[in-house]
Amino acid sequence: MKRLEVLFFLVVVSLFSCKNSSDEHNNIIHKIKKSPHDFMFMQRAYPSGELKTDAYSKAVQWKKERIYRSTNANVLWEFAGPTNIGGRITDIEIPVDKAETYYVGAASGGIFKTTDGGDNWLPIFDEQEMLSIGDIEISKNNTDIIWLGTGEVNAGGGSLAYDGNGMFKSDDGGLTWESRGLPDVGSISKVLIDPVNEQTIFVGAMGPLFKKNNQRGVYRSTNDGQDWEQVLLVSDSTGIIDMSIHPNNGNIIYAASWERIRRPNNRQYGGETSRIYRSQDGGDTWEELTNGLPSDPNDKGRISIDISQSNPEVLYAFYTDKIGNVEGTFKTTDGGDSWAEVNSISNGTSYHWWFGGVFVDPTDENIVYNSGFVMEKTLDGGTTWGSTFSNVHVDQHAVAFNTQVPGEVLIGNDGGLYKSSTNGDTYQKDNTLPITQFYRFYVDPQNENKVYGGTQDNNTIRTTSAGIDDWQPIFGGDGFQPLVQSDNTNIIYALSQRGNLGKSINDGVSFNGALNGIPSSDVNNWDTAITFDPADSQTLYYGTQRIYKTTNGAGNWGVISPDLSNGPHSGNLAYGTVTSIDVSPLDSNLIYAGTDDGNVWVTQDSGTNWTLVSDTLPNLWVTKVLASSSDVSQVYVTYSGYRYGEEHGHVFKSEDYGTTWSDISNNLPDIPVNDILKDNYGNLFLGTDIGVLASADEGENWEPLGVNMPSVVVNDLHIHENSEYLYVATYGRSSYKLDISNNILSTSFTTLASAITLYPNPASDYVNLSFIEAGEDYKIEIYDALGKKVLEKNNVSSSSDGRIYLNGISAGIYYINVYSDTDQTTKKLVVN
């Protein structure tokens, strides 16, 4: 293999060891808000610029086929929080006949249902392939009928990696779901049920975010979703971002189109084909509405439209311009024939394409909410606007009115769910939804109760009690890798987007900038790499396109490498940065680095010489380089992305410092791998886009680990050495943990699994356990979908059917652990 030796003269270090004069690196702003970035898409799409959604689907099916017959099928994850931080909400719906039942759609966390006004929530979409939620619609005639359009429409590639997979319908209040087509329309913005004929359904589709095609527009089904017809296509780069239907006449439909082009290197969020359309014949024909509406292509970006339920002649439309600024709010009182601009909201950010919604109170045509950067409301039809739900988390996306409870309004934003009983004048945040989107994770090395995480748009957060509902922010912006110094845990490092590093010496009470010596002209990854030297807590490494080292706890940094990437890349592509750094715990001179454009490097002399060791490895985004803790010459590397006509895997191992590599992916599906760790028993764990996978035999065989975690992106893994717990940071379902103090992986399949049958399943009042062979007593434990034990029963006899009564157990998905003296298995139970 060709080897590239780089001698990096130490004199270069002196060029960058001087104090950086830029204040931006030394001033920490605790709420840094920038427009959403393409990070998650970029790492999965490199170098082709596309995602293989068919490969993702196959990977999910691979997992489903194995999860209950896996050698690890008896493993249950314990939910580790948080519930009180929240995450991005895309939709909220309230049935017209159930005042305390709400359905909430999360951007990447599925659907949650409550029947007690938000005290308790149940995930009801976890068995499905995609947890990205677009729009929920509930029948007014039978509120057990729910339609769902998958795929988040908010155009933030930093948080959006996968589109949806079409339409789903539930006839039992969300307990079970059936696919109803349109798997290729990308993200679905709106689902409408014809108020007269509920067999007729309309769907607004934005199409795939990162490519042009004609699978977007308005779709119609006249036979309950069995067949679909595209009834409006504006262009191959213009989708439907919002729709409304006349409450009494299903022939009258309004659709707002949005010309939207997003690529890793460019963005266009508006243009001539951003329009409002109306159909008066049930979607057969459409007319563009123009009278009084913006006409200049530069003035037409994302458009939201809503119809008054109390006076259907009144509609409101909210326009952003092509850049994302507020263009105006427009109102019609004649069903759309003519429009007039009313006063508009005041919040002025330049990325209203991230939200920009308008919602009319169903009981009063003059009360309108606008979901912008903050939430604003008018009580007089748009003449004046004022703030409502003041001081909630920014970036508003959803509003729901409870028509059975006057004054009750729910809103959803990037920080979760808020509920008001006073029309927004006062409110409470919901602290029970487990939908936080983690990027990175860390646990205090001396105190397992102090757990840290970096989150999407919800800061760097922590709990000091290992609780699930008491997490608090300590460092602003999008949070990334936190670190805690092992010999003085009052010293904490925290990162926000693009490498903004802060250091606290008072246990997180305050932070100061910690980038002295790193030029602001360097290129930072959205998720900047940073790590400790395991042997010296004062020594840290930090990656831009180069690697920097500090030996005095970030007092100052010096560069120890050349540009390790293949950059600078052409255009606006942000590739060309270090994504992973790892220092051998056996030799501090041995350092590995990986980049977002496929390079893997090693130095064995603390950075004086660097060797490129990736010539035979895939040209994909490197997510993790892991130096072995048991063999100094052993190293692992993992990759994001997909195969395109190539047979390479996503996990590789070297026994000679990277000189040669073995692909240990083997039966692993074609799926991005985001992290790898190894425990004291030699077990390997992978964080992937479909959850956690594990191998007990150095990658010869990979199996799903645990049965109660949905197919959610796992960005980070962390093993806490003292407590011997494995922590998992998910992107949309908060975090989980697992006791690995004993060897949890087995190389043989359980025999108990095939010896037990559950019936009835689904169950209501009780479930029977039927045993093939009698003669032994068993212990039974039932856990909910979040890993909370809800029932335990000992000495269940196998001599006859063991009946377990389900008193007090709500409808939902549960897992029954069955223990014998020598074996254990887990069975899935549906309670309805």
Positions of the model-derived regions?
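Low-complexity, Pro/Thr/Ser/Gly/Ala-rich linker/spacer regions in secreted
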Residues: 739-755
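Beta-propeller blade termini and top-face loops
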Residues: 21-742
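C-terminal outer-membrane/trafficking sorting elements
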Residues: 6-9, 750-759, 763-832
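C-terminal motif of bacterial Sec signal peptides marking the signal peptidase cleavage site
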Residues: 16-17
